[in-house]
Amino acid sequence: MKKVIITVFSVIIGFIFIYSLVWFESYQNSLGFYDQATESFENGEFGLALKGGDHYDAELREYVYTGGYEQVLVAWANKWAIPKPSVYYKAEEKINEIIYDKLTADEGFALFQQYFRVSNRHLPEILIQTGKLYIENEQYGKAEAVFQLAIDAFGRNETIRVEAQTQLELLNQ
C-alpha cells in the first residue's frame, strides 16, 4: 500500500513539474510575442501587430518572423491551459483596440483580403467594423458590399450573419 501511495504521489508531482515547465515556456513565448506585437502597434503596423508575420529586416538583410497579439491568444487557446496569464488578457484588449479604434475602413478591408485564406479568428469582427466605418464615411456602396461579403464568408457564424443582415436592412431603409 505504501508503494502505491508513493507511486501515485510521484506521478502527481511529475505531472505538476512537467505542466509547470510547459506553462512557463508558453508564458515566455507569449511575452515575446506581446512585446513584438506592441512594437508593431506603436509603429502603426496594425495588421502585423494583430496577426504577426514575416517581414524584411533591413539591418539583418533577411526576413524575420514577428509575433502578433493573436499568437498570444493561440498559445493559451486550449481549455486546459490554465491559469491564463495577464498577458493573454492584455493581448485581447489590444486586439479590440486595433479592430475598433485604430483601423480605418480601407485598412480593415485590406486586412480581410490579406488574411482571408489564413486562419484568423478576428476576420469576421474586422469585416463588420469595416462596414460600419464605411457607413461613417458615407461610402454606402462599399458598406453594403462588405456586409454582404460578411454574410457570404461567415454565414455560419450566427452573430456575424445577424449583425451583417441588420446593417444591410438599416442601409436599405
Language-model segments: which ranges?
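Hydrophobic membrane-insertion alpha-helices, especially the h-region
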Residues: I5-E25
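Non-cytosolic head/periplasmic domains of membrane-anchored proteins
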Residues: V87-Q173
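Hydrophobic/aromatic side-chain positions at a characteristic register within alpha-helices
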Residues: V22, N29, Y34, F41-E42, ...
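Flexible helix-coil transition and linker loops at the boundaries of alpha-helical arrays
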Residues: S20-W23, R61-S86, G108-N120, R156-N157
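Short helix-adjacent coil turns
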Residues: N43-L48, E138
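Extracytoplasmic/periplasmic/luminal assembly and interaction segments
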Residues: F41, L50-D101
